[in-house]
């Protein structure tokens, strides 16, 4: 766990993701997956809505357009400043969402135990060389979701600590 200071004078605890071996292999070498866990003292439906409802996504991630499982997200802040294509591959609300983002595979699972909702995010099929660049991006987006759910100021990418060396 690391502490990061935001541009608003806030201190937020940020959980690192893990780089794990991927079962699949690429033609040019090893693949890894990025695995993240977060826990929220909120009902699963509240966390699910924050991560899937267009109106809520617009408050912490960016504007969402499109339909029928093919969406475009225009990020409001972050490492990617262009519109991002998202295709929903599988959705079992409020527990599982599998999407393809610009050709990449992302799995999100949510489980509620008592008053705590656990969120597991897995970004699959990452080349080991790209993990250092991609890892901090998903950590940052999860930190924005966390800040949104906790009614805290959203972290800004420009103020975000560089964490590339933590994703090897």
Model-derived segments and spans:
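Terminal "cap-and-tail" regions of soluble proteins that handle hydrophobic small molecules
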Residues: 1-29, 116-118, 122-168
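Intrinsic-disorder/low-complexity coil detector
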Residues: 20, 42, 74, 78, ...
């Amino acid at each position: 766990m690391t502490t990061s200071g935001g541009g608003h004078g806030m201190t937020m605890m940020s959980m690192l993701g893990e780089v794990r071996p991927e079962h699949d292999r690429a033609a040019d070498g090893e693949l890894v997956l990025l695995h993240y866990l977060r826990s929220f003292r909120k009902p699963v439906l509240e966390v699910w809505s924050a991560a899937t409802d267009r109106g809520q996504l617009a408050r912490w991630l960016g504007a969402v357009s499109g339909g029928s499982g093919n969406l475009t997200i225009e990020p409001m802040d972050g490492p990617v400043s262009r519109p991002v294509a998202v295709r929903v591959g599988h959705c079992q609300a409020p527990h599982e969402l599998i999407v393809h983002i610009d050709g990449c595979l992302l799995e999100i699972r949510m489980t509620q135990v008592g008053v705590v909702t656990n969120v597991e995010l897995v970004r699959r099929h990452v080349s080991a060389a790209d993990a250092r660049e991609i890892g901090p991006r998903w950590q940052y987006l999860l930190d924005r979701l966390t800040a949104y759910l906790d009614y805290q100021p959203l972290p800004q990418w420009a103020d975000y600590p560089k964490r590339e060396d933590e994703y090897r």
